[in-house]
């Protein structure tokens, strides 16, 4: 058995790719997500559609049905006030893959998990809704591998599972890898503060399907239109910046928002009002880590068994790169296929770790170059935030 901890894009892509490449492998996908909870990370590039087709034609059919029903919104392009105070437009019509999407992220992730659960007629792939508690290695002569302890939602009971390979797709917390001795190396301390806005009875209809990006004195902003008359606004700054303290509360977040030129205009012109991100909650900013990080080591092959990390657990990207979700899914595909071939005993994948490490290093190196390039374009602001981001 292979156990994948994490039911987001990386974990689901790994499960679907593994199933596609080696249908005989028994896989358990452990998911602890709340499908009703709001989640940022809503931008899906247009070329991701090809990957969904590759992973599962049924998945892509369900996804396109959701698009037709308005569950996800088309992204018409980007408008950014970055290196200059003026907005510069990039239109999706010039993209050979077409328009990207602004997702209902919780619904998209659930669609992926449904595809994993529906890939087999028997019990080859199982999705378990529960929380990863701990992992133990066993080197007994009769069984060499891992014992994983899971607390099930609902009953609260603890189940145990055995696996030869573990895939850590648990996100930035890297729950499995860190229990096995790996460490997350953070190269910056970027935070993302986010608030959800909703249309009201007096709201002017919002036809702006762009992602609008705006650099500011101590960070940068973006806004994207979401389904059901909603809009997300996100502010990025370092955790030690004075504005981070302000952004943690609604009044401070809205005051900082008022200082923007374009983002505030989108909200004001359409009459949006701040709303809670969940039922029964007060409208206040959420906060999540958004900096660059990578896991050391990101994998380990113990010959008879092993583990590896994928997605944000292995390497997490600054949202400016717009690489997080698409790269997580691509790496999930690579990992799933590599594990499938390894378990078939193909001779060219004996050194699984070396092959995947080279791939991970290439991905991270390209990302760091691109991130440095984009931040270096901004020279109109001075101060600790921009000094921390420029490479010169």
What are these regions (language model features)?
Residues 337-392:
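C-terminal helical "tail/cap" subdomain of flavin- and related membrane-associated enzymes
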Residues 34-83:
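N-terminal FAD cofactor-binding segment of flavoenzymes
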Residues 71, 241-335, 342-344, 348-350:
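FAD/FMN-dependent oxidoreductases across multiple families
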Residues 11-12:
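N-terminal Rossmann-fold NAD(P) dinucleotide-binding loop
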Residues 93-115, 243-248:
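Short beta-strand to alpha-helix junction loop
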Residues 115-271:
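Predominantly flavin-linked oxidoreductase catalytic cores and closely associated redox partners
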Residues 3-5, 19-42:
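Glycine-rich FAD pyrophosphate-binding loop
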Residues 85-104, 145-147, 230, 236-239:
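Helix-loop-beta segment of a Rossmann-like dinucleotide-binding subdomain
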């Amino acid at each position: 058995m292979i156990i994948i901890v994490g039911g987001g894009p990386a974990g689901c892509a790994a499960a679907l790719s593994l199933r596609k490449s080696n249908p005989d492998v028994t896989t358990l996908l452990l998911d602890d997500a709340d499908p009703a909870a709001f989640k940022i990370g809503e931008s899906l590039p247009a070329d991701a559609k090809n990957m969904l087709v590759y992973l599962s034609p049924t998945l892509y059919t369900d996804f396109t049905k959701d698009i037709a029903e308005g569950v996800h919104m088309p992204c018409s392009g980007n408008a950014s006030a970055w290196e200059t105070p003026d907005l510069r437009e990039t239109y999706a019509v010039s993209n050979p893959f077409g328009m990207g999407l602004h997702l209902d992220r919780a619904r998209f992730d659930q669609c992926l998990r449904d595809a994993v659960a529906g890939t087999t007629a028997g019990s080859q792939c199982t999705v378990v809704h529960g929380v990863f508690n701990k992992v133990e290695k066993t080197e007994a002569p009769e069984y060499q591998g891992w014992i994983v302890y899971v607390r099930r939602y609902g009953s609260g009971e603890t189940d145990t599972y055995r696996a030869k390979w573990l895939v850590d797709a648990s996100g930035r917390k890297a729950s499995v890898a860190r229990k096995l001795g790996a460490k997350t190396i953070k190269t910056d301390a970027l935070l993302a503060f986010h608030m959800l806005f909703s249309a009201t009875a007096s709201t002017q209809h919002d036809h702006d399907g762009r992602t609008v990006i705006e650099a500011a004195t101590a960070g940068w902003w973006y806004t994207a239109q979401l389904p059901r008359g909603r809009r997300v606004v996100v502010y990025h700054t370092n955790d030690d910046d004075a504005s981070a303290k302000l952004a943690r509360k609604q009044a401070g977040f809205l005051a900082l928002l008022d200082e923007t030129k374009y983002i505030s205009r989108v909200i004001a012109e359409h009459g949006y009002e701040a709303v809670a991100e969940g039922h029964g909650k007060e409208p206040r900013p959420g906060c999540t880590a958004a900096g660059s990080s990578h896991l050391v080591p990101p994998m380990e092959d113990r010959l008879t068994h092993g583990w590896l990390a994928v997605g944000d657990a292995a390497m997490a990207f600054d949202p400016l790169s717009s690489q997080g979700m698409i790269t997580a899914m691509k790496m999930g595909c690579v990992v799933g296929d590599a594990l499938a071939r390894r378990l078939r005993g193909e001779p060219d994948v004996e050194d699984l770790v070396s092959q995947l490490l080279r791939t991970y290093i290439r991905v991270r190196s390209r990302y760091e170059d691109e991130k440095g390039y984009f931040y270096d374009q901004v020279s109109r602001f001075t101060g600790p935030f921009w000094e921390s981001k420029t490479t010169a």
